[in-house]
Design a protein with these regions (language model features):
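Short helices/loops that flank or line small-molecule/ion binding pockets
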Residues: 70, 79-80, 84-98, 111-113, ...
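Beta->alpha turn/N-cap motifs
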Residues: 41-45, 79-84, 93-105, 121, ...
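A ligand-binding cleft/hinge motif common to bilobed small-molecule-binding domains
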Residues: 85, 102-110, 154-162, 182-209
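Ligand-binding cleft/hinge of the Venus flytrap
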Residues: 53, 65-74, 152-172, 202-206
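Extracytoplasmic small-molecule ligand-binding "clamshell" domains
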Residues: 26-101
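Flexible hinge/capping segments at coil-to-helix
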Residues: 127-144
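Short Pro/Gly-enriched coil loops immediately N-terminal to beta-strands
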Residues: 112-124, 138-139, 206
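A structural signal for short loop-to-beta-strand junctions that line the ligand-binding cleft
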Residues: 28, 60-61, 108-118
Length: 209
């Protein structure tokens, strides 16, 4: 399944979206006056966001933030933000825009504005090769988990409860690093992935998450 990712916005007018109003105009004015655009970016999710050998933020989402700031003639400021904190960072004013692989959902749209999609991912389930999991259905009755606050984790948690198997369980992890550690211990997790292949040492099962 492909899931389209969007920018989560507090400055819809800046991106040419149809939403308009005093609040958006004021926000854009504040950004231009400050001379910087603060982008909430997740930096443990390569190639979308990570750090290079010099500890500088790099990745597609980082580039997108830089391009957006350039279009506004301001300086880009990367605000490192874990997946669970993306929307809180925007709502609280710690960031002006989320550029962090955020799926557009109705629930999120009730709280924040969304841009048009800018990227599409393939949904996969990451497992250890020795788990014997070959399909999404094989996850029933297994310990599963995902990174808290992500669309994939929310969908898998919902399915895990719907399966009603007492042997199964779901756990949310606070970072991609914690999720990767769980995979190494035999927990299966959903993730947005760039085709064609998952990370070395993992097997890929189909998923509708």
């Amino acid at each position: 399944m492909n899931t389209k990712k969007t920018l989560a916005l507090a400055l819809t007018a800046a991106l040419g979206c149809s939403l308009a109003g005093l609040a958006q105009a004021d926000k854009l004015d504040d950004i231009i006056e400050s001379g910087k655009l603060r982008c909430a970016v997740t930096l443990d999710f390569p190639p979308m966001g990570s750090r290079d050998a010099q500890n500088n933020p790099v990745g597609f989402d980082v580039d997108y933030c830089n391009d957006l700031a350039k279009a506004l003639d301001v300086k880009a400021e990367i605000v490192e933000t874990p997946f669970p904190d993306r929307i809180p960072a925007l709502v609280s004013g710690r960031a002006d825009v989320i550029v962090a692989s955020t799926s557009d959902t109705l629930e999120r749209a009730r709280t924040i504005g969304m841009s048009i999609p800018y990227f599409a991912f393939v949904k996969v389930v990451l497992t250890r090769e020795d788990t014997g999991i070959a399909s999404y259905a094989d996850l029933k009755g297994r310990p599963v988990g995902g990174t808290a606050g992500t669309f994939e984790a929310l969908a898998l948690e919902k399915d895990s409860k719907a399966w009603g198997d007492a042997k199964g369980s779901f756990r949310a992890y606070q970072s991609e690093a914690d999720t990767a550690l769980a995979i190494s211990r035999g927990i299966s997790t959903p993730r947005s992935s760039l085709p064609p292949s998952p990370p070395r040492g993992s097997s890929r099962a189909s998923t509708r998450a």
